Design a protein with these regions (language model features):
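Hydrophobic alpha-helical transmembrane segments of multi-pass integral membrane proteins
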Residues: 1-353
Length: 353
Protein backbone atom coordinates (compact mmCIF):
# COMPACT_ATOMS: atom_id res chain seq x y z
CA UNK A 1 0.00 0.00 0.00
CA UNK A 2 1.40 3.39 -1.06
CA UNK A 3 1.45 6.00 1.67
CA UNK A 4 0.53 9.45 0.43
CA UNK A 5 2.15 12.49 2.01
CA UNK A 6 -0.15 15.40 2.76
CA UNK A 7 0.92 18.15 0.29
CA UNK A 8 1.42 20.65 3.14
CA UNK A 9 4.11 18.38 4.59
CA UNK A 10 5.74 17.25 1.34
CA UNK A 11 8.43 19.96 1.31
CA UNK A 12 10.19 21.73 4.17
CA UNK A 13 9.23 25.25 3.18
CA UNK A 14 5.46 24.67 3.03
CA UNK A 15 4.46 24.48 6.71
CA UNK A 16 7.10 26.94 7.91
CA UNK A 17 6.43 29.64 5.31
CA UNK A 18 2.73 29.37 6.15
CA UNK A 19 3.31 29.40 9.91
CA UNK A 20 5.71 32.34 9.65
CA UNK A 21 3.21 34.35 7.61
CA UNK A 22 0.39 33.61 10.04
CA UNK A 23 2.48 34.38 13.11
CA UNK A 24 3.84 37.63 11.69
CA UNK A 25 0.27 38.93 11.35
CA UNK A 26 -0.84 37.60 14.75
CA UNK A 27 2.24 38.95 16.58
CA UNK A 28 1.98 42.39 14.96
CA UNK A 29 -1.72 42.61 15.85
CA UNK A 30 -0.93 41.65 19.45
CA UNK A 31 1.83 44.28 19.58
CA UNK A 32 -0.51 46.97 18.26
CA UNK A 33 -3.11 45.91 20.83
CA UNK A 34 -0.52 46.12 23.60
CA UNK A 35 0.45 49.62 22.46
CA UNK A 36 -3.19 50.63 22.77
CA UNK A 37 -3.50 48.95 26.19
CA UNK A 38 -5.72 46.04 25.12
CA UNK A 39 -3.26 43.19 24.54
CA UNK A 40 -4.27 39.63 25.34
CA UNK A 41 -0.82 38.39 26.34
CA UNK A 42 -1.25 39.44 29.94
CA UNK A 43 1.44 40.79 32.26
CA UNK A 44 4.55 38.65 32.18
CA UNK A 45 8.25 38.91 32.83
CA UNK A 46 9.03 39.92 29.25
CA UNK A 47 8.21 43.56 28.40
CA UNK A 48 5.98 44.06 25.37
CA UNK A 49 8.63 45.70 23.19
CA UNK A 50 11.07 42.85 23.79
CA UNK A 51 8.37 40.25 23.16
CA UNK A 52 7.60 42.03 19.87
CA UNK A 53 11.26 42.04 18.83
CA UNK A 54 11.71 38.42 19.88
CA UNK A 55 8.71 37.20 17.92
CA UNK A 56 9.66 39.12 14.78
CA UNK A 57 13.09 37.49 14.94
CA UNK A 58 12.42 34.01 16.36
CA UNK A 59 8.74 33.64 15.52
CA UNK A 60 8.91 35.04 11.99
CA UNK A 61 12.36 35.50 10.41
CA UNK A 62 14.10 32.36 11.70
CA UNK A 63 11.02 30.29 10.88
CA UNK A 64 11.37 31.31 7.24
CA UNK A 65 15.11 30.57 7.44
CA UNK A 66 14.28 27.11 8.82
CA UNK A 67 11.85 26.38 5.98
CA UNK A 68 14.28 27.75 3.41
CA UNK A 69 17.15 25.72 4.90
CA UNK A 70 15.26 22.42 4.77
CA UNK A 71 14.32 23.04 1.14
CA UNK A 72 17.68 24.44 0.01
CA UNK A 73 19.72 21.65 1.62
CA UNK A 74 17.50 19.08 -0.09
CA UNK A 75 18.29 20.79 -3.39
CA UNK A 76 22.03 21.21 -2.64
CA UNK A 77 22.66 17.65 -1.47
CA UNK A 78 20.05 15.61 -3.34
CA UNK A 79 19.20 14.00 0.02
CA UNK A 80 15.75 13.95 1.59
CA UNK A 81 14.94 16.37 4.41
CA UNK A 82 12.05 15.68 6.81
CA UNK A 83 8.66 15.28 5.19
CA UNK A 84 5.34 13.73 6.09
CA UNK A 85 5.04 12.84 9.77
CA UNK A 86 8.53 13.99 10.72
CA UNK A 87 7.94 17.41 9.14
CA UNK A 88 4.55 17.56 10.82
CA UNK A 89 6.21 16.89 14.18
CA UNK A 90 8.70 19.71 13.54
CA UNK A 91 5.81 22.05 12.74
CA UNK A 92 3.94 21.10 15.92
CA UNK A 93 7.17 21.50 17.89
CA UNK A 94 7.43 25.05 16.49
CA UNK A 95 3.80 25.80 17.42
CA UNK A 96 4.43 24.55 20.96
CA UNK A 97 7.44 26.86 21.14
CA UNK A 98 5.29 29.84 20.19
CA UNK A 99 2.26 29.17 22.38
CA UNK A 100 3.78 27.32 25.34
CA UNK A 101 5.69 30.30 26.83
CA UNK A 102 2.41 32.26 26.94
CA UNK A 103 1.25 29.84 29.65
CA UNK A 104 4.46 28.98 31.48
CA UNK A 105 8.08 30.07 31.28
CA UNK A 106 9.12 26.40 31.46
CA UNK A 107 7.95 25.93 27.88
CA UNK A 108 10.61 28.30 26.52
CA UNK A 109 12.94 25.29 26.31
CA UNK A 110 10.87 24.09 23.34
CA UNK A 111 11.39 27.38 21.52
CA UNK A 112 15.11 27.35 22.37
CA UNK A 113 15.62 23.82 20.99
CA UNK A 114 13.85 24.36 17.65
CA UNK A 115 16.72 26.02 15.76
CA UNK A 116 19.46 23.65 17.03
CA UNK A 117 17.29 20.71 15.90
CA UNK A 118 16.96 22.20 12.40
CA UNK A 119 20.72 22.87 12.42
CA UNK A 120 21.46 19.23 13.33
CA UNK A 121 19.19 17.94 10.55
CA UNK A 122 20.67 20.06 7.77
CA UNK A 123 24.22 19.90 9.13
CA UNK A 124 24.20 16.09 8.98
CA UNK A 125 23.08 16.14 5.32
CA UNK A 126 25.64 18.78 4.34
CA UNK A 127 28.43 16.73 5.96
CA UNK A 128 27.25 13.57 4.19
CA UNK A 129 27.94 15.33 0.90
CA UNK A 130 31.13 17.01 2.23
CA UNK A 131 29.73 20.42 1.25
CA UNK A 132 31.80 22.29 3.83
CA UNK A 133 31.14 25.63 2.07
CA UNK A 134 27.50 25.44 3.13
CA UNK A 135 28.14 24.65 6.80
CA UNK A 136 27.71 28.35 7.58
CA UNK A 137 23.94 27.81 7.57
CA UNK A 138 23.67 25.19 10.37
CA UNK A 139 26.39 27.02 12.31
CA UNK A 140 24.47 30.30 12.22
CA UNK A 141 21.23 28.51 13.14
CA UNK A 142 23.01 26.96 16.14
CA UNK A 143 24.31 30.35 17.28
CA UNK A 144 20.82 31.80 16.86
CA UNK A 145 19.51 29.02 19.11
CA UNK A 146 22.11 29.94 21.75
CA UNK A 147 21.19 33.63 21.49
CA UNK A 148 17.52 32.71 21.89
CA UNK A 149 18.40 30.89 25.10
CA UNK A 150 20.46 33.84 26.34
CA UNK A 151 17.53 36.15 25.65
CA UNK A 152 15.14 34.08 27.76
CA UNK A 153 17.67 33.67 30.57
CA UNK A 154 18.32 37.42 30.70
CA UNK A 155 14.64 38.35 30.29
CA UNK A 156 13.70 36.12 33.23
CA UNK A 157 16.59 37.44 35.33
CA UNK A 158 18.72 34.29 35.41
CA UNK A 159 21.82 35.99 33.97
CA UNK A 160 22.99 39.57 34.32
CA UNK A 161 23.12 40.78 30.73
CA UNK A 162 20.94 43.25 28.87
CA UNK A 163 18.32 41.12 27.09
CA UNK A 164 18.45 43.51 24.12
CA UNK A 165 21.97 42.30 23.29
CA UNK A 166 21.00 38.75 22.20
CA UNK A 167 18.02 40.16 20.29
CA UNK A 168 20.08 42.69 18.33
CA UNK A 169 22.85 40.12 17.81
CA UNK A 170 20.26 37.73 16.39
CA UNK A 171 18.98 40.35 13.95
CA UNK A 172 22.54 41.04 12.84
CA UNK A 173 23.14 37.31 12.28
CA UNK A 174 20.00 37.11 10.14
CA UNK A 175 21.26 40.05 8.09
CA UNK A 176 24.58 38.19 7.67
CA UNK A 177 22.61 35.23 6.25
CA UNK A 178 20.93 37.66 3.86
CA UNK A 179 24.28 39.10 2.81
CA UNK A 180 25.83 35.67 2.22
CA UNK A 181 22.89 34.06 0.43
CA UNK A 182 21.74 37.28 -1.23
CA UNK A 183 25.23 37.85 -2.56
CA UNK A 184 25.03 34.47 -4.28
CA UNK A 185 21.48 34.42 -5.62
CA UNK A 186 20.48 38.03 -6.37
CA UNK A 187 23.08 38.65 -9.11
CA UNK A 188 22.50 35.13 -10.43
CA UNK A 189 18.71 35.52 -10.58
CA UNK A 190 19.20 38.91 -12.25
CA UNK A 191 21.52 37.50 -14.91
CA UNK A 192 19.08 34.66 -15.62
CA UNK A 193 16.11 37.02 -15.89
CA UNK A 194 17.70 39.66 -18.13
CA UNK A 195 19.47 38.34 -21.20
CA UNK A 196 22.76 40.03 -22.02
CA UNK A 197 23.02 42.05 -18.80
CA UNK A 198 26.57 43.04 -17.86
CA UNK A 199 27.24 42.95 -14.12
CA UNK A 200 30.25 43.77 -11.98
CA UNK A 201 30.79 40.66 -9.87
CA UNK A 202 34.10 40.20 -8.11
CA UNK A 203 34.52 37.46 -5.49
CA UNK A 204 37.41 39.21 -3.76
CA UNK A 205 35.44 42.45 -3.41
CA UNK A 206 32.38 40.54 -2.16
CA UNK A 207 34.56 38.82 0.46
CA UNK A 208 35.94 42.18 1.62
CA UNK A 209 32.40 43.57 1.92
CA UNK A 210 31.33 40.48 3.88
CA UNK A 211 34.27 40.93 6.27
CA UNK A 212 33.47 44.61 6.77
CA UNK A 213 29.83 43.72 7.44
CA UNK A 214 30.71 41.21 10.15
CA UNK A 215 33.23 43.63 11.67
CA UNK A 216 30.68 46.45 11.74
CA UNK A 217 28.14 44.31 13.56
CA UNK A 218 30.70 43.10 16.12
CA UNK A 219 31.96 46.62 16.74
CA UNK A 220 28.43 47.94 17.18
CA UNK A 221 27.51 45.17 19.64
CA UNK A 222 30.56 45.79 21.85
CA UNK A 223 31.23 49.50 21.21
CA UNK A 224 27.94 51.06 20.03
CA UNK A 225 28.99 54.61 20.91
CA UNK A 226 32.35 55.00 19.18
CA UNK A 227 33.75 57.09 16.35
CA UNK A 228 35.58 54.03 14.99
CA UNK A 229 32.36 51.99 15.02
CA UNK A 230 30.47 54.81 13.32
CA UNK A 231 33.05 55.25 10.56
CA UNK A 232 33.39 51.50 9.89
CA UNK A 233 29.60 51.10 9.72
CA UNK A 234 29.25 54.01 7.28
CA UNK A 235 32.12 52.69 5.15
CA UNK A 236 30.48 49.26 5.13
CA UNK A 237 27.24 50.86 3.95
CA UNK A 238 29.06 52.53 1.06
CA UNK A 239 30.80 49.25 0.11
CA UNK A 240 27.49 47.37 0.28
CA UNK A 241 25.91 49.99 -1.97
CA UNK A 242 28.73 49.63 -4.53
CA UNK A 243 28.25 45.84 -4.41
CA UNK A 244 24.52 46.24 -5.05
CA UNK A 245 25.08 48.66 -7.95
CA UNK A 246 27.31 46.05 -9.58
CA UNK A 247 24.32 43.72 -9.81
CA UNK A 248 22.49 46.31 -11.99
CA UNK A 249 19.33 46.80 -9.90
CA UNK A 250 17.79 49.39 -12.25
CA UNK A 251 17.78 46.85 -15.07
CA UNK A 252 15.20 44.80 -13.14
CA UNK A 253 12.44 47.42 -13.26
CA UNK A 254 10.21 45.27 -15.47
CA UNK A 255 10.85 42.06 -13.50
CA UNK A 256 9.06 42.29 -10.10
CA UNK A 257 10.20 38.82 -9.05
CA UNK A 258 13.78 40.16 -9.23
CA UNK A 259 13.46 43.86 -8.38
CA UNK A 260 11.97 43.07 -4.97
CA UNK A 261 15.28 41.38 -4.07
CA UNK A 262 17.26 44.45 -5.13
CA UNK A 263 14.85 46.84 -3.40
CA UNK A 264 15.04 44.82 -0.19
CA UNK A 265 18.82 44.48 -0.33
CA UNK A 266 19.10 48.27 -0.69
CA UNK A 267 18.02 48.53 2.98
CA UNK A 268 21.20 46.70 4.01
CA UNK A 269 23.66 49.44 2.94
CA UNK A 270 21.18 52.01 4.23
CA UNK A 271 20.95 50.12 7.53
CA UNK A 272 24.73 50.16 7.97
CA UNK A 273 24.88 53.90 7.29
CA UNK A 274 22.06 54.52 9.78
CA UNK A 275 23.84 52.29 12.29
CA UNK A 276 26.89 54.52 11.90
CA UNK A 277 24.76 57.63 12.36
CA UNK A 278 23.30 56.10 15.54
CA UNK A 279 26.85 55.67 16.91
CA UNK A 280 27.35 59.40 16.34
CA UNK A 281 24.04 60.02 18.14
CA UNK A 282 22.46 61.53 15.03
CA UNK A 283 19.55 59.07 14.82
CA UNK A 284 17.95 56.45 17.04
CA UNK A 285 19.33 52.93 16.76
CA UNK A 286 15.76 51.73 16.21
CA UNK A 287 15.73 53.38 12.78
CA UNK A 288 18.74 51.30 11.72
CA UNK A 289 17.34 48.13 13.29
CA UNK A 290 14.02 48.53 11.48
CA UNK A 291 15.79 49.26 8.19
CA UNK A 292 17.37 45.83 8.61
CA UNK A 293 14.22 44.28 10.07
CA UNK A 294 11.37 45.57 7.89
CA UNK A 295 13.01 46.80 4.71
CA UNK A 296 15.74 44.19 4.25
CA UNK A 297 14.52 41.12 6.13
CA UNK A 298 10.81 41.61 5.42
CA UNK A 299 11.49 42.45 1.78
CA UNK A 300 13.91 39.59 1.14
CA UNK A 301 11.60 37.14 2.88
CA UNK A 302 8.54 38.04 0.78
CA UNK A 303 10.71 38.03 -2.34
CA UNK A 304 12.36 34.68 -1.61
CA UNK A 305 9.34 32.77 -0.30
CA UNK A 306 7.26 33.62 -3.36
CA UNK A 307 10.14 32.67 -5.64
CA UNK A 308 11.14 29.44 -3.90
CA UNK A 309 7.52 28.36 -3.50
CA UNK A 310 7.05 28.68 -7.28
CA UNK A 311 10.40 27.16 -8.20
CA UNK A 312 10.22 24.11 -5.94
CA UNK A 313 6.68 23.25 -7.06
CA UNK A 314 7.46 23.38 -10.77
CA UNK A 315 5.52 26.54 -11.54
CA UNK A 316 6.51 29.46 -13.74
CA UNK A 317 8.64 31.87 -11.69
CA UNK A 318 6.73 35.05 -12.38
CA UNK A 319 5.16 37.51 -9.95
CA UNK A 320 1.45 38.18 -10.42
CA UNK A 321 -0.63 41.09 -9.15
CA UNK A 322 -0.97 39.65 -5.63
CA UNK A 323 2.76 39.05 -5.27
CA UNK A 324 3.62 42.52 -6.59
CA UNK A 325 1.13 44.07 -4.15
CA UNK A 326 2.86 42.25 -1.29
CA UNK A 327 6.27 43.45 -2.47
CA UNK A 328 5.12 47.05 -2.63
CA UNK A 329 3.31 46.94 0.72
CA UNK A 330 6.38 45.64 2.59
CA UNK A 331 8.60 48.35 1.11
CA UNK A 332 6.02 51.08 1.72
CA UNK A 333 5.66 49.86 5.32
CA UNK A 334 9.42 50.24 5.83
CA UNK A 335 9.34 53.79 4.46
CA UNK A 336 6.32 54.74 6.59
CA UNK A 337 8.03 53.38 9.71
CA UNK A 338 11.11 55.50 8.97
CA UNK A 339 9.04 58.64 8.40
CA UNK A 340 6.98 57.93 11.50
CA UNK A 341 10.01 57.53 13.71
CA UNK A 342 11.90 60.50 12.30
CA UNK A 343 8.92 62.82 12.69
CA UNK A 344 7.87 61.26 16.03
CA UNK A 345 4.81 63.14 17.35
CA UNK A 346 1.64 62.98 15.29
CA UNK A 347 2.91 60.72 12.53
CA UNK A 348 4.36 58.17 14.97
CA UNK A 349 1.15 57.86 16.96
CA UNK A 350 -1.03 57.85 13.84
CA UNK A 351 0.92 55.15 12.02
CA UNK A 352 2.16 52.97 14.89
CA UNK A 353 0.46 53.89 18.14
Amino acid sequence: MIKKTIPLFALGFRPFYLLAAFWSVAAILEWLMELSGSGIRGIGSIPGIQWHAHEMIFGFATTVVAGFSLTAVRSWTGLETPKGRSLMLLAFFWIAGRLGPLFSSYFVIIDILFLPIIAMIIGKLILQRSMVRNLFLPLILSVLGILNGLFYMSAYGHIGIDSNVPLISSLFLIVMIEIMIGGRVIPSFTANAIVGIKQFRNKSFATVVLAFSATSFLLWIFFPVSVVTALICILTGVLQFILLLGWKPLATRSKPIVWILHAAYFWIPLGFILLGFSSFGLVSMYIALHAFGIGATGGLIIGMITRTAMGHTGRLIKAGAIEVSCYVLVQVTAVIWMVAHLTVGVWFHFTIG
